[in-house]
Amino acid sequence: MSFCPSMCLGCLHPQVLLLQPFNYAKNMTQQKQPISLNPLVMYRGVHANAVNMGSCTMIQFAVGGRLKQMILNGESRHLSLGEEMASGIAAGTVSGLAGSPLELIMIQQQRKGLSLGATIGDITAKPANIMRGFVGCAVREALWTCGYLSIPPVVRRTLMETYPDTFPDNNRARIPAALLGGLFACYLTHPFDTVKTCMQGDIERKIYGTFSQTAAKIFSDSSIFGFYRGATFRYGRMCCAVFIMDLLKEKVGYALYPEAFA
């Protein structure tokens, strides 16, 4: 797909509003904070999260689509798994530049309950806060992008070619592809996400300092299991998100840009 269609598809997804409660519960669990069932609390920071998901997904689709075009260089063939994954990793890393500050706003709103404007003012009072947690975000997004942009198409194609009777079309193969992509994206990236979330929830640096200091603190408090706090909520959200976005990529993409799927 070309650059512009990829950007358009990146903006068109409804999953952030549907899955915000999963995101809230995951963030609170990672920081060892109580979970509220009040929808007004669960949806704190949803505006920043919507912008985050829209902009990051747009960047990932656009950069990933352009890189795949460059790799193919006009050839009519499928990308290899390595080529798919390399494109996803690069696209995800770039998207972290936008995603990290926006997630910081969301997490601070969830922790403090301030308005959007007050939260931005609180963060920018110390400019060093703006990119707090970027390393964790960049690594997580790099691997996550592989999980939803790179792995599902390869898995779907492999299942349909290897087991054509069981998986005769994309619709049948999509569910196992989403489960595998979500599993890869969740458990491989979750330790980085936990470190990032703890750092962004503590901009005052009372408990968590740098990336390495935060990782050491989590390990000393809870051993390796501390890095997987909130993983159940995240995996549930990711499987739903991968399914929605893989479906959207195919159905909406084909409707808007049929020539790209010829």
Predicted features along the sequence, with ranges:
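Short glycine-rich, polar/acidic loop-and-turn segments at beta strand-coil junctions
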Residues: P21, T29-Q31, V46-H47, S55
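Interfacial helix-start motif at the membrane-water boundary
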Residues: P39-M53
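Flexible extramembrane linkers and terminal tails adjacent to transmembrane helices
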Residues: M1-C11, A25-L40, F61-V139, W144-F225, ...
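Alpha-helical transmembrane segments of multi-pass membrane proteins
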Residues: Q15-K26
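Hydrophobic alpha-helical transmembrane segments
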Residues: M53, T57-Q60
